[in-house]
Each structure stands twice: as C-alpha cells, then as structure tokens.
Regions:
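Active-site-adjacent "subsite" loops/lids of carbohydrate-active enzymes
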Residues: 126-147, 220, 224-290
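Carbohydrate-binding surface patches
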Residues: 492-555, 592-595
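Aromatic-rich carbohydrate-binding modules that target alpha-glucans
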Residues: 604-647, 657-680
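C-terminal outer-membrane/trafficking sorting elements
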Residues: 722-777
Length: 777
C-alpha cells in the first residue's frame, strides 16, 4: 500500500471518529400514560409562594416528581416520601416570570412512563403572560340552577387552564350607569342588562371572590362611549354625543341598533373631557361596590366619518388614547385593556403605554382571516408597544355553525379549535376563548356550541403547554423570529417555512437566548388556510410520525429536545442528533397539530460581526464578510462590543458568521434607522432576519462604541467614550429646572434622569410649567 492510500484511509478514520463524536447517542424512550390527574391551588404564583399540588389516580410505588424549566431539571423527588394523601407542596425558585412543568413519572426498564403533567406559572404580574378567560352568566334562573356550585366548578376548570385574568362580559346595568342603585343608595341585588337578562349582584361578587382565591384578576367590561336612550335623565349631555350625517345631510347621533333589546346604544365622543369625568365617577362606583382589578374597554370599530356636537370631525383613535389615559390617571393601580376591533386604533391604543397588553378582535373579510394574518397582528403590536406588550386574540371559532343557536351536532369542532390555538400559541399569542363555555360568537353569553370531553382535555394540555413553556413561546417578542432552514428527507412530506401552506408542515422559528426554537405546525391534509373554521368542518391533520429533519445553524448544538401538547402531556422528549457542516439532523417522534423542537447551545452566539458600507476596514466597506469587523463577546455571552470607525449616512448591520449561506442577520426594525448623535438617542431594537433587510446608520463619520445585548435584542451606538450614557433625551436640562413623575404620579429622581439610569418605561417630565411624555427604552 502506498503513502497516498494510508493518508486517504487515515482521513477516513478521522472523519468517522469526528462523526461518532458528533453523534449524540440514543436516549431513553418517553412513554405516555397520563392516567393521573394533577391540580394546583392557583393559576399564578408570586415569587417565593408555595404551590399546593394534588394527584388523583393510581400511582406506582417507584413514582418520581420532577420539576422542569424547559428541559432543565430544577428538582426531583420520590413521590411517596413527599406526598400525604396524594397532596404535596413545592416552592419554586424565587425567580420572577418563569414557567415550569411538573411531571409525575416512573421507570419501566430504561423507559420513562409519564403518568401526569401540570404547568406552574411564577409571575408577579399577570400581564407578562396573560391567559385571559371570561364569564357572562350571573343568573340562578329563579333557583332552578345551583349557581354557587356552578361558579366553583367553572372557576376550578379555568384554574386548571391557568387562566390568570377573567373578563366580565355584559355584567352591568346600563352602559353609562353600570351599577344600579336603589332609592336608598344601596346597589340593587337584581337588575336586567341591555338584552333583558337577569343579573344577580351576589353572583358577580362570588365570581370575583373565587377568582381572587385562585390568583386570577377580575376585569369588568364596558364600552368607552356607550349610553342608553334615556341617558340624558342620568346626567349625560347631548353635547357629548358622536354624530353622523344621514342621507339628507342632517347630523344625527350615531347609535348601535339592538332590535328588541332594552335600548339601542348611543355613542359619545370618547375624548370629550366631560364624558370622561362622568365615566370616571361611574367607574368609581364600580370599584367601590365590587373588587374588580381593572377595566376591559370596548369599541365598535371604524364608524366612518364622525362629528362632535359642533360638527367638528372626530378621529376616534385620538379619543381612545385620551379616554385610556384619563381612566389610568383616575385609577393608576387598575389594569386597562382595550379592544382593537378589526385592528382599528391598535397603534394608538398600544402607544399609550397604559394598557396591560394588546387585545385584538379579529374577523374574516378584513385582512385578518388567514393564519398568516395572525402573525401580522402580533408583529405590529410588538412594534406599537416597543416589544413590551403581549397579544391576546378575541377570535370566534366555528362562527357560522354557531349562528342562531347552533346547527348540526351543536358541538365545537375540535380540529378547528386545536389548529388555531396551536398557531396562535406558537406565534407567541393567546386566545380568549374559555369561560362558562367556549366562545363562538362576539356576544359572549351565547353558548350555541358545546365542548366534547376530548376538547376539554385537549384544552388542559394546550394551556399547560403555553404556561410551562411561556419563556420560550412568549419570553421575547417577534423581533426574535428567525428564518432557520428546516428540511426533511421524507419523500411524502413537504416542510415549508412560515407562512402556512396547504398540505405541508410549516415551520416557524425563534431565537430565545441560547435556544433555537422550531415550531412545526401541521397543515397536511388541509387546503383551508383560514383560522376561523366557520362551519366546523376542519378535519384532523395527517398524523406524521418519526419525521427526519435537518436544521441549518452555525451554532454548536449540545442538546435537541421536543415537546408537544398533543402527546405525553407536553413532557420533554430528548432527541438523538448529529451535527456536521452547520446541519443538525434528528427525528421528530410525532406531529399531530403542533410540535416544538428546541436546539440548545452553549452560547447565544459564538461570534458576531459588523458589516456594511459604513464599516471601514482596510479602506473598504465590509460587504465581504471576511472584511467584517468582529465584536468582542462578554464572559456571560449575552453582550458583544466593539469600538470602530463608522461612515455617516451609510448602512451597517450584524451577522453571526462569515458564510452568507448559513449565517443569521441582525437588522433594524425600521428602514434606514439613523442614530442621531445630536440628541444621543442611542438604544433600539434588533430584529433577527427581519422580513425586510433594514439596516442602521449613524449621522456623522467618527469612532463609535457599539454594544449588542442579545438577551434583549437591543443595540446601542454612541460616540466613543460616551457609552456610559444609557438614554439621554433631546434637551440637556439643568437638574433644578425639571421634575419627573411616573404614570402613577410618583416623583422620580432627576439625578437618575440626568445620568441615564432611569428604568425603561414612560414618564412625565415637567419644566417651567410645561409637561411632556418621555419614553426610556
């Protein structure tokens, strides 16, 4: 044998060793039993609060309790040494805004058999991960119904779904007079709402008390501009009204007609300060007599051209902003949520900074009917709220089937509901759908369609999944959405990147720190790409098992795992994988509606490079990635920094590698974003592989400190030597001339403002009698 042969064989041997090292060996099988039901005592826990758990079912002697955050095992204990009468407690780590999955399992040989799972949410504020439900029936029907028992049963189920906020729909008397009083000034025990339904005050209060015992928030509903026909007799002025012009050109008050109900709804100018003062007083009566935690504000969408009493044109979204701010100023400690019907006013609502999250009532026929439109809503909301607000959809399933009392089997269609929830949850949204029934119409009391037991159980699994993995699903906004290339060698399966495609598996990916998360959404067997399933005819997607996948990434992957709400209660399934030449290969055990695959690496990014015509290296703009400027990675891997020369008014961006075929870009949120050194506004969002390849600029040539925070996807660029300045607003004001307050009216240190250490948020700055809103990002 000659020398070349030995070299060739040596290279082949070395390659085989490398491949062997790259292969992550077989892992234990995870088997579904799910015969044990688990419950917790609350829907949400504050950091440091103890969780009380109960198991119901046959529990083998060798059963273990395991607590996971993602795939990481936080704690593990033998069940029978821990539990008394199948009840036990657990105190999670005192870390805020975290989701956990509790797994009950036992081993059979080397395999793990999952007996039951349940999620735990540790969050000091519900708005970080809102899971919104509703109630809409407050009647005992003349004693024929044990309403107290029903309330306990309904709220126990919502607690099992980890619903942490509940909207009270159509609970009030008149829209302009929500609390009805007797002649002696005490609240009426019974009254009729606008649809002439009977409402029992004690049942409203009972719901609130039970919800509070579960750690839920109770939110009352009302329009921002609604009044009954007799409102003038209750102190509402005609001059506050909202007017339209009829076919003859006459000005008539706009109203929402409700045939055969107690009254039509006559609309007021929401921005009218006298109307706002009137409603503040009415809301104070609400808060005085009921322990509500906030106000769900409603509207009726775009009403066309509108006028005030003096025939001035009214732009409703401006009025929404004014109304929200007035309600917040009146009761700053209370939650506010406002409906963006058909997306109307969504941007103005979110930009107030005074709503807990974005709430979008979406419909067909207005650009929101397709699955793809759901992501558009989330992405837009993220931008409007500076990536600080979550999105909750009001989206009514099986709408036509539910018309006028329902048709056919009068059941919610399980495949339609589950595929829509799978998409919404995978994209980072939530869905208000669960209450004393499942929503199918915009009139919440309408319970036209019932849920099957199969659907009720599936909802538990889906809400467990959304809660347990909330940090991966909703921990960072759509700016972290990436474009990972996902391929399969299965000949009869098509894998397509978002947006949805008929008869394909669709992948949606997101980078969450050192996790690359790939959501597989199953559209096999369907050509209907509308989320609505209006007639309840959607069938189950084609079950796909043992699906071979390859993901292209230039991260070094050290673990791959999968989880699905459709199997094994969402438990983690670690997957064997190989990695070679930037491609990670593994097999997904099953995909029914939705499976999440997570690729974990040691670091968020192993390198980061600055590229573009603004970057000067060897005299040339660094479009050639080998000419790009490398940034220095911090010890914790969360930030990258560099001081470099940049040309003014020329573009730059960031990449995580030197091969355009495999690297990821980090872009600007808006086209041609320019860092303005005259006002030194320095910190902005980064987007991963944005739909548009937007880049950044500086306004003048010079040396700049560049700091990239990958954990928050924020970019900071300042003139070299000024990087200690976090945010400085346009005017350099002497300390003694200004005062600053938060939105609750509490004074804030001027020194914090001047040295750039104010926390992110919205503040009111007052100078020489003038006030303005400032945003610290």
């Amino acid at each position: 044998m000659n020398r070349d042969h030995f070299l060739k064989e040596g290279r082949r041997f070395l390659l085989s060793i490398l491949l062997l090292l790259a292969f992550q060996g077989a892992v234990a099988a995870v088997i579904s039993d799910m015969s044990v039901e688990l419950t917790t005592d609350k829907a949400r826990y504050n950091p440091g609060q103890t969780v009380q758990l109960t198991a119901t079912g046959n529990i083998p002697q060798n059963t273990m309790v395991r607590y996971r955050h993602g795939a990481t095992v936080v704690e593990e204990q033998p069940f029978h040494s821990l539990a008394q009468d199948n009840k036990w407690s657990w105190t999670p780590p005192a870390i805020d805004f975290r989701g956990y999955l509790v797994e009950l399992y036992h081993k059979v040989g080397s395999d793990e058999v999952i007996l039951g799972t349940i999620a735990v949410d540790v969050s000091s504020d519900w708005k970080r991960f809102p899971r919104y439900g509703f109630v809409a029936d407050f009647n005992n029907y003349s004693g024929t119904v044990d309403k107290d028992a029903n309330i306990r049963t309904e709220m126990a189920y919502l607690n099992r779904l980890h619903i942490n906020g509940v909207q009270f729909q159509d609970w009030h008397w008149k829209h302009h007079q929500p609390v009805k009083f007797e002649s002696n000034g005490t609240p009426s025990q019974w009254y009729q709402d606008i649809s002439k339904r009977y409402i029992g005050t004690r049942y409203i209060k009972k719901y609130i008390d039970v919800q509070h015992s579960y750690g839920m928030k109770s939110i009352f509903y009302n329009l921002c501009y609604g009044a009954w026909e007799d409102a003038v007799s209750d102190g509402v002025k005609k001059e506050w009204g909202l007017f339209k012009r009829d076919n003859s050109g006459n000005y008539v008050q706009d109203c929402h007609e409700l045939k055969d109900w107690a009254s039509d709804i006559y609309l007021q100018v929401p921005g009218n300060s006298d109307w706002q003062e009137y409603m503040k007083a009415r809301n104070e009566e609400v808060y005085t007599n009921y322990k509500f935690d906030g106000f769900q504000i409603d509207q009726l969408g775009d009403r066309g051209t509108l006028y005030d009493y003096n025939h001035n044109t009214v732009y409703l979204p401006d009025g929404f902003t004014s109304f929200i701010n007035a309600m917040k100023a009146s009761r700053p400690e209370k939650s506010l949520i406002m409906n963006a019907v058909h997306d109307y006013g969504a941007e103005r609502i979110a930009r107030t900074g005074n709503v807990d999250f974005c709430y979008n009532e979406v419909w067909g026929g207005n650009g929101h009917e397709q699955f793809s439109h759901l992501y558009d809503v989330i992405r837009n909301n993220d931008r409007y709220g500076d990536h600080q607000l979550q999105t909750v959809f009001a989206a009514y399933m099986n709408y036509d089937k539910a018309f006028e009392g329902g048709s056919g089997d009068k059941l919610m269609n399980t495949p339609g509901v589950l595929l829509t929830d799978a998409v919404m949850f995978a994209l980072g949204g939530a869905h208000i759908e669960m209450g004393d029934h499942m929503l199918c119409r915009e009139y919440f009391p309408a319970a036209s369609l019932a849920m099957t037991d199969e659907l009720k159980t599936a909802m538990i699994r889906y809400y467990d999944f959304m809660t347990a993995y909330q940090n991966l699903l909703r921990g960072i906004s759509s700016k972290a959405a990436s474009s990972l290339k996902v391929e399969t060698t299965a000949g009869n399966v098509t894998v397509s990147a978002w947006p949805p495609r008929a008869n394909a598996i669709v992948s949606f990916s997101k980078n969450v720190e050192n996790h690359q998360v790939v959501h597989l959404l199953n559209f096999r067997g369907t050509s209907d790409l509308s989320w609505r399933d209006v007639n309840g005819t959607r069938t189950k997607p084609t079950l796909t098992e043992n699906l071979p996948l390859t993901v292209t990434t230039n991260r070094t992957i050290n673990k791959v795992w999968a989880a699905t709400p459709d199997n094994i209660g969402g438990a983690v399934q670690e997957l064997a994988f190989t990695q070679q030449n930037g491609k990670v290969s593994f097999t997904v055990p099953s995909l029914q509606y939705w499976t999440m695959v997570v690729l974990e690496s040691e670091n968020i990014e192993e390198q980061l490079l600055m590229t573009g015509e603004a970057v000067q290296r060897d005299g040339y703009g660094a479009y050639d990635l080998h000419q790009a400027v490398p940034l220095k990675r911090s010890d914790d891997g969360l930030t990258f920094t560099v001081t470099t020369h940049l040309k003014g008014n020329k573009y730059f961006k960031f990449t995580n590698g030197t091969d355009w075929a495999t690297c990821t870009s980090f872009n600007a949120e808006y086209s041609g974003y320019k860092f303005n050194n005259s006002n030194r506004s320095t910190t902005v969002n980064l987007l991963i592989n944005g739909s548009n390849d937007y880049k950044f600029m500086v306004d003048a040539d010079g040396d700049y400190d560049v700091i990239v925070d990958l954990s928050q996807l924020r970019l900071k660029v300042v003139k070299a030597g000024e990087s200690q300045v976090k945010v400085v607003l346009p005017d350099e004001l002497p300390q003694e001339t200004i005062s600053i307050f938060d939105l609750r009216g509490r004074a804030v240190s001027c020194e914090q403002y001047l040295n750039g250490t104010l926390p992110r948020g919205i503040y009111i700055l007052k100078q020489n009698g003038m006030s303005r809103k400032i945003i610290i990002r």
